[in-house]
Swiss-Prot record:
Keyword terms: Antibiotic resistance, Cell inner membrane, Cell membrane, Membrane, Transmembrane, Transmembrane helix, Transport
Domain of life: Bacteria
Family note: Belongs to the major facilitator superfamily. EmrB family.
Compartments where located: Cell inner membrane
Keyword Transport in record: yes
Protein name: Colistin resistance protein EmrB
Expression induction or repression: Cotranscribed with emrA. Induced during osmotic stress.
Annotated CDD domains: MFS_LmrB_MDR_like
Length: 512
């Protein structure tokens, strides 16, 4: 920070830690609930009697609501105060979690899931803002580590926890586990001191056109990115409407943000070089975090045919590594050049992704182990230290807006990454299937030998033995093509991460 930041405690240390601990646990629940349903969509689909497409909205509606709420949290927390706003979000998140578990059909679940996402989206940036308000500059390393640890741990272990709860109890418990912690968090925050003062006069000067424009822009963008890949982009009416809503909303929001004397969201933070480069970096981190959290479980489920518990067992390595390595960063941040630290972290994470890009149809836990180790350490370094670089050169008055934008960039990065993965996966798989099929000729002795073996194996079935053998071979071809497609995407992601690492050359060191 700069001269505006106080060097002394504004509150007793125990009070500051109690408030912050409650806030980051709420932050953990909000981030966890993004991915907790990922490994249990089949069970939710069966419970709600929904189609495979309809049930994907359980995730989509949460993300749309969350991505709208994140930047809005800045202005609302200034109007109501951080304490009151966070308490309202915690209560809303808890009540909506209960209602999700009590949903009587898919439509009601989606409504309550949207409320849950909106309330969770308010908690995430508010807890980052509180970090800078609660702790003096010399004492921020450990809180930053804890914040980063929670931000990465949620997506990493969400599918594991969701799969375990669903297999051992029912899918309803993915939401019921939020109730008791939510009540405790709301009580602790509301009973604590005011971190800042409410300013109700801001309501009179609030730019409501910008607010509507921002909601249209972000909601339309999230829908366009999430649903476009599934429906051939602008060929679908709903996706076209979302794109137009996004464009119109963006024109309203950005035009007013640069022309109004008191804009809804202060975009001048992008004039700060460190913040802009850090925002780009966290965008790529979002692509990696959410993209890998999607690709690896899909590979394990579709190609390796693992169930949700087995997938969770493989994926938990990353979460454990992140959790164990995070405390080390509290010592690393004040003692090393943070730019070099981010460079090493991004290269290490990219190296882990590159190692993962050698998947085969036989890849298992042992193959995934070391790539997850490197990736977990690298991503944890980047998430924590990049947030320090982004915020440490900004005045305290700009932190609320900056934290909302910074967290938004990571979420948009994740949405863009998932959209690119989904849209690329189909045509890459089709390309690899064509390439493999071209080699499946009578002159290919591997193909003919495999066909003869399978035909002999299925002779007992009857006269369709060769047809059954061919269907098995074509299934294996699809699995091989899908695996090759994942490898292509993983290599591209690794290259993007390697290139992004060099942005640190242009950053300032930032305050320790």
């Amino acid at each position: 920070m700069n001269k505006h930041v106080e060097a002394e405690w504004r509150f007793p240390a125990k009070t500051a830690w109690a408030i912050f601990a409650a806030m980051i646990f709420g932050n953990f629940m909000a981030i966890l609930d993004i991915q907790i349903v990922a490994s249990s969509l089949n069970e939710v689909q069966a419970g709600m009697s929904a189609s495979r497409y309809e049930v994907t909205w359980v995730q989509t509606v949460y993300l749309i609501a969350e991505i709208i709420a994140i930047p809005m949290s800045s202005i609302v927390s200034r109007v109501l105060s951080t304490r009151v706003y966070y308490t309202m979000c915690a209560i809303g998140f808890t009540v909506s979690s209960l209602l999700c578990a009590l949903s009587w059909n898919l439509e009601s679940l989606l409504v309550f899931r949207g409320i849950q996402g909106f309330m969770g989206g308010g908690m995430i940036p508010t807890s980052m803002t509180a970090l800078y308000l609660l702790f003096p500059e010399p004492k921020r390393s450990l809180p930053l580590v804890m914040f980063g640890m929670i931000s990465t741990l949620g997506p990493a272990i969400g599918p594991t926890i969701g799969g375990w709860l669903t297999n051992n109890f029912s899918w309803h418990w993915m939401f019921l586990i939020n109730i008791i912690p939510g009540i405790i968090i709301a009580t602790v925050i509301y009973s604590g001191p005011n971190i800042d003062r409410a300013n109700y006069s801001l309501i009179k000067s609030m730019d409501w056109f910008s607010l509507v424009g921002m909601a249209m822009f972000l909601g339309g963008l999230e829908y366009f990115l999430d649903e476009g890949a599934r429906h051939d982009w602008l060929a679908d009416t709903g996706v076209r409407i979302a794109f137009m809503v996004c464009v119109v909303g963006g024109m309203i929001f950005f035009s007013r943000s640069f022309t109004q004397p008191k804009p809804l969201l202060d975009l001048s933070v992008f004039k700060n070089k460190n913040f802009t480069l850090s925002a780009i970096t966290t965008f790529v981190i979002g692509m990696a975090l959410y993209g890998l959290g999607y690709m690896i479980p899909v590979f394990l489920g579709q190609v390796r045919e693992m169930n949700s518990s087995q997938i969770g067992h493989v994926m938990m390595v990353t979460g454990i590594v992140m959790f164990c390595f995070a405390p080390f960063l509290a010592w690393l941040i004040p003692n090393f050049d943070t730019r070099k630290t981010v460079f090493v972290g991004m290269i290490l994470a990219g190296f882990g992704v590159w190692l993962n890009s050698h998947l085969s149809i036989h890849s298992d836990y042992d193959f995934m182990f070391w790539p997850q180790i490197y990736r977990g350490i690298g991503l944890m370094i980047c998430l924590i230290v990049v947030s320090h670089l982004a915020m440490s050169t900004l005045p305290l008055s700009k932190v609320a807006d900056a934290s909302g934008i910074y967290n938004l960039m990571r979420n948009i990065g994740g949405a863009v990454g998932l959209a690119l993965i989904n849209s690329s996966l189909d045509w890459l798989t089709a390309m690899h299937v064509t390439q493999i099929n071209q080699s499946m000729t009578p002159q290919n002795w591997i193909f003919t030998e495999r066909l003869d073996q399978l035909t002999a194996q299925y002779q007992e079935v009857g006269t369709n033995a060769q047809q059954i053998a061919l269907s098995v071979i074509y299934r294996d071809i699809h699995f091989q093509a899908l695996t090759s497609s994942f490898n292509d995407l993983l290599r591209m992601l690794a290259i993007i991460m390697f290139v992004t690492a060099f942005l640190t050359i242009f950053m300032d060191r930032g305050k320790k």
